Regions:
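Transmembrane-helix boundary motif in ABC transporter permease subunits
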Residues: 1-6, 71-103, 116, 120, ...
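Interhelical loop and adjacent transmembrane-helix boundary motif
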Residues: 2-5, 35, 50-58, 200-254
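Transmembrane alpha-helices
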Residues: 11, 17-24, 115, 147-150, ...
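A structural signal for multi-pass alpha-helical bundles of membrane permease subunits
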Residues: 22-35, 65, 115-126, 193-198, ...
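Periplasmic/extracellular loop-to-transmembrane helix junction in inner-membrane transport proteins
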Residues: 36-73, 225-226
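Membrane-interfacial helix termini and adjacent extracytoplasmic/periplasmic loops
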Residues: 38, 42, 47, 96, ...
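Hydrophobic alpha-helical transmembrane segments of multipass integral membrane proteins
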Residues: 60, 64, 68-80, 84, ...
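Short hydrophobic faces within alpha-helices
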Residues: 63, 88, 105, 160-168, ...
Length: 257
């Protein structure tokens, strides 16, 4: 009976994974199709579509913009997230639990809700639809990611390390930079990698706040509206490989915690 139950569970898990990830394998496979129309079976394999991508100016520009937004928003979220997570961990004050729930709102609310809200609110502040608006939008939800990742590490940190450093005469600022930060560096690296991936893949907020310049996901969306070609498959394959590598690295650093 146990063997049958184990087989059913294993088969069900395998079926779910196939349903989720088999389409990705199909995309990777068809990205090497030499023909412009996807057909099965593939008669001729080629790297032509990857080469063509390297000459696609709009795609290259979209990649540059995506990296620009991802890096700046991650840095901003890191600068705000580390001290915020430290304050949430170290100090107890009225409304702390409520504040933590509010901080988590950007990652719990649907992206379309956040995008519409920012689209309505930013003009009141005199912020036009632009890369600046996209940068602020990405930073908003990345702060929540950064705080949750680093706060989890703070909770596992030995409190006696900080106490010992203080007893030896170290100032609070020196304790933070010489004792606290080195002990949470793996969590910081993992949070940074995860934030970069999420920013690079973000669509709803970007869609509502972008102007004429496109990020990579928006550019891919525009290409798909004209039909799925092997060039789209090639872009999707590269994005998948880069995202997977970053996520695995993030998990590796988080596992070390």
């Amino acid at each position: 009976m146990k063997k049958i139950r184990s087989f059913i569970i294993s088969f069900s898990a395998f079926s779910v994974f196939c349903f989720l990830y088999f389409p990705i394998l199909i995309i990777i496979w068809f990205s090497f199709n030499k023909e412009s129309v996807s057909s099965f079976p593939i008669e001729h394999y080629s790297f032509d579509w990857y080469i063509k991508l390297s000459h696609n100016e709009s795609m290259i520009q979209a990649v540059k913009i995506s990296f620009f937004i991802a890096i700046l928003s991650t840095i901003a979220a890191l600068i705000i997230g580390i001290p915020s997570a430290y304050a949430l961990h170290k100090y107890n004050y009225f409304g702390k639990n409520l504040l933590l729930k509010i901080i988590l709102l950007p990652i719990t609310l649907p992206g379309i809700v956040t995008g519409v809200a920012m689209l309505s609110f930013f003009p009141m502040l005199g912020i036009p639809l632009s890369l600046k608006a996209v940068l602020i939008g990405h930073t908003t939800f990345l702060i929540a990611i950064m705080i949750t990742q680093i706060l989890a590490r703070f909770k596992k940190l030995d409190p006696y390390l900080e106490m010992a450093a203080s007893d030896l005469g170290a100032s609070p600022l020196r304790v933070f930079f010489k004792v606290i930060l080195p002990n949470i560096k793996t969590a910081i690296i993992g949070a940074v990698l995860l934030s970069l991936v999420l920013s690079m893949d973000e669509i709803p907020i970007t869609f509502f706040l972008i102007s004429r310049d496109n990020t990579l996901p928006i550019e891919i969306y525009g290409m798909m509206r004209r039909g799925i070609t092997p060039e789209v498959n090639a872009v999707a394959t590269l994005v998948f490989l880069l995202s997977s590598a970053a996520i695995f690295m993030s998990l590796k650093f988080n596992k070390e915690n």
